[in-house]
Each structure stands twice: as structure tokens, then as C-alpha cells.
């Protein structure tokens, strides 16, 4: 990540809580500097809502992300599949992604895992990484 970058170039699983009354999904996808393929078509939309139920109040939510390299990615919330896409790739239109594009290769098949709180307090517990075999 370069200095003064607003957000890291990433595939982001976004957690959002409800306000007690308004529907608001969690386990969404945000794609700063990246694109994905959904239902066979390249998707350039920055944030895509999942099909999850709203999680109101202070409750623990189980989130799982199944990532098969540059293949499929699935988001699960409380054990339910809520979002699925594939072929994560760098967006050549995004200036912050350009330094990461080597020999025209856009596919993202590796990277780092980060936990981040943007605007509200968040707690994480029992974080684990399990290889897909």
C-alpha cells in the first residue's frame, strides 16, 4: 500500500450493524481498486450488498469467508451463504492499483488478511484461518 492511499487495494468483506429498525445487510463486498466476476459478468460496482438478514444491537455474528485463490469467494453470515463471486482482479482504471499490475496480469491469487474498524467500534474473537484441502 502506498502512502496517502484512502483505502488499500483489496477485496473487502464489510460488516454493518443495524440501527434497530432499518434493514441493512452485513457480509457485503467492497472493492477499492479491484473488480470481481459475478454471475459470469465483470462487476465494477464498488460495494455490493449481500443477502444477509440485518443484525441489530450488540450480538455476536459468525462470519466466514471461503477463498479459493483467484477462483471463487463465498461469504457466509451465521452459517448462511449470503454472497458469491469469482476471479478477483486489479482494476486498471484505479491509479492506486496500477503499481500492483505486473506485465498486464490483473488476477489476484494471493495477499494479506487484515481486520479493520473504519467508523465504529468493533470486536473480533475466535479468528482462525483454515486451509482449503
Regions found by a protein language model. Give the residues of each.
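Carbohydrate-interacting regions of secretory-pathway proteins
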Residues: 1-133
Amino acid at each position: 500500500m502506498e502512502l496517502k492511499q484512502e483505502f488499500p487495494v483489496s477485496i473487502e468483506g464489510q460488516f454493518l450493524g443495524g440501527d434497530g429498525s432499518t434493514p441493512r445487510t452485513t457480509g457485503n463486498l467492497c472493492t477499492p481498486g479491484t473488480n470481481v466476476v459475478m454471475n459470469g459478468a465483470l462487476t465494477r460496482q464498488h460495494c455490493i450488498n449481500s443477502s444477509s438478514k440485518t443484525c441489530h444491537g450488540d450480538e455476536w455474528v459468525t462470519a466466514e469467508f471461503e477463498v479459493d485463490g483467484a477462483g471463487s469467494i463465498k461469504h457466509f453470515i451465521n452459517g448462511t451463504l449470503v454472497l458469491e463471486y469469482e476471479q478477483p482482479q486489479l482494476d486498471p482504471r484505479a491509479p492506486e492499483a496500477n503499481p500492483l499490475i505486473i506485465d498486464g496480469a490483473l488476477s489476484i491469487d494471493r495477499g494479506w488478511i487484515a481486520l479493520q474498524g473504519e467508523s465504529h467500534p468493533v470486536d473480533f474473537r475466535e479468528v482462525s484461518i483454515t486451509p482449503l484441502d
